[in-house]
Amino acid sequence: MIALVLGASSQIGYCLLPLLQAEGIEVLALSRRPTRSAPTDVRWLQGALPALPLALPPLRYVFGAGPLDALAAWLPAAPLTPDARVLATSSMSAVSKQDAPVAAERALSMRLRTAEQALAQTCARRGVGCTVLRPTLIYGVGRDRSLTPLARRAQRTRVFALPRGRGLRQPVHAGDVARALLAAALRAQPLDALLEFGGGERLSATQMFARVRASLPFATLGVPLPRALLALAALHPALRGPITRLDQDLIADNARAVAALGVTPRAFHPDARCWGL
């Protein structure tokens, strides 16, 4: 059995590779950038979809941990075994940013939903299984672009900004997303489904930022950001979307995923390793 992992150097790919190795699955790992500290028994391919650097053998599993639209564009010509399964991640941004005030975020939502549909149609046409997860905010191995930058900025400045937000958050660990993808791959029967997948705990945005700060291995000065300052900052196009969502619930309903895959994600209790510190 051969598995191709797309986006293998991403945070999900980082967690997925050792899980596949533990199952005795031969792994081809594709990444756009050379990978340091790569497992020695994984064959690394440098490149990006839809163009691959060399011909591939028939694939039993295709794991998509990179851009979903690129996977959807490449899949029609992919070399798949008759019983192949496609396991990929989209994002809850497909839903949460559908009516965002920023045009680029609305475009991202549309691109994700279009790719989800195209992927499902291609898999149905080719007769292979297709499971797509919509994770919430992913963290855990210091490679995310949401919480890790906050932790590392605090490391440099010893100051931690604390935005106040009433909206609920449900951060999910990259390792739990990887476990869910593997569970979908190893099911006795293929699971053709689009599943929401969040962390094991819902908490306010304010609480989430406070826990990130508490996880740091050094002292910081916590600086609450008043709403008036946030409203002023929201005038900047790059900040408008994130600030607007502070009072919105960005959560997932895990019921279907947990029932189908048997993976229960962990609660949000990060430590310094989650930020690569």
Describe these PLM feature segments:
Residues 3-23:
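N-terminal Rossmann NAD(P)H-binding glycine-rich loop of SDR-like oxidoreductase domains
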Residues 183-241, 259-262, 266-277:
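Mid/C-terminal beta-alpha module of Rossmann-like enzyme folds, strongest
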Residues 136-143, 164-174, 199:
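Glycine-rich "substrate-gating" loop/helix at the edge of Rossmann-like oxidoreductase active sites
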Residues 6, 30, 65, 86-92, ...:
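SDR active-site strand-loop-helix element
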Residues 36-83, 88, 92-102:
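NAD(P)H-binding glycine-rich loop region in Rossmannoid oxidoreductase-like domains
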Residues 106-131:
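Active-site Tyr-X1-5-Lys
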Residues 152-172, 184:
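A conserved pocket-lining segment of Rossmann-fold NAD(P)-dependent short-chain dehydrogenase/reductase
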Residues 29-35:
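N-terminal Rossmann-fold cofactor-binding loop
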